[in-house]
Amino acid sequence: MRVEAKYSKEPYNEAVKKNSSSIKLLEYNGNNVPKDMNTFYDLYWNDKGFYARFLSFHNGQIKFCPKETEILENGKTFKLWAISEVCEIFISHAELEFYREFEFAPDGRFLDIAIENRVGERKTDFNWVSNLEYKSKIYDEHWEGFVFIPWTAFGGKAPNLGDIWHGNFYRILTRDEKELYLAWNPVYKINFHQPQYFGEILFV
C-alpha cells in the first residue's frame, strides 16, 4: 500500500485540511470497523519536519492513563500503549529493520522510541528523544491529535520530492474492557512490530 505525504508550508491550516487525502485504519487483520471506531490520519511535510493529524472516533469509551502515572523528565510516559488508548506511527527512513515508534494518547501524553528489529531480536531505546511536539483535544464523538516531528529524528535530512519511506499507522483502543487493534496496512496478528508489512510513504 502507498500513501502520499503532501508538502505544505502551513500543514494545519483549514485549506490544507480540505485538500488532504486521509488514511483510514482497519482492523489489524484487514476487516472493516464500525463508524464509532473510525480512525483517519493526514500526513504532511516541509523543510522543518513531518506532520500528522489524526481523528479517532469513539462512543464515549476512552481509556486514559491513571492520573498518578509519572511523566518522565524527557516528557515521555513509559509503556503508554499498555495503560492508555493510543494512536501510533511507525516510520523507517532507511533499512526496514531500523524504525521510529511514536505513540500519542488522548490526554496529550506521548512516547517516542528508536528500534532495531532484526530477525529473532528487537532492541528498544527508550532514552532516545525525537523532540516531537504534540497536542490533542477531545470532542463528544472523536479525539484529535496534531504531531510535529523534526527531521533530526530521522538523521537530520529532509526527504526530496519523490522519495519513498516506509511505515505503518495504528490505534489501540478499548471497548467493553476488550482491547482492539487497528492498522493502516494489515499485520494479520496482534503484533505491530512487523516491518515487513510497512507500506510506502511517498513525499509529494
Predicted regions and their residues:
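Structural preference for beta-rich elements and adjacent junctions enriched in aromatics
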Residues: 1-204
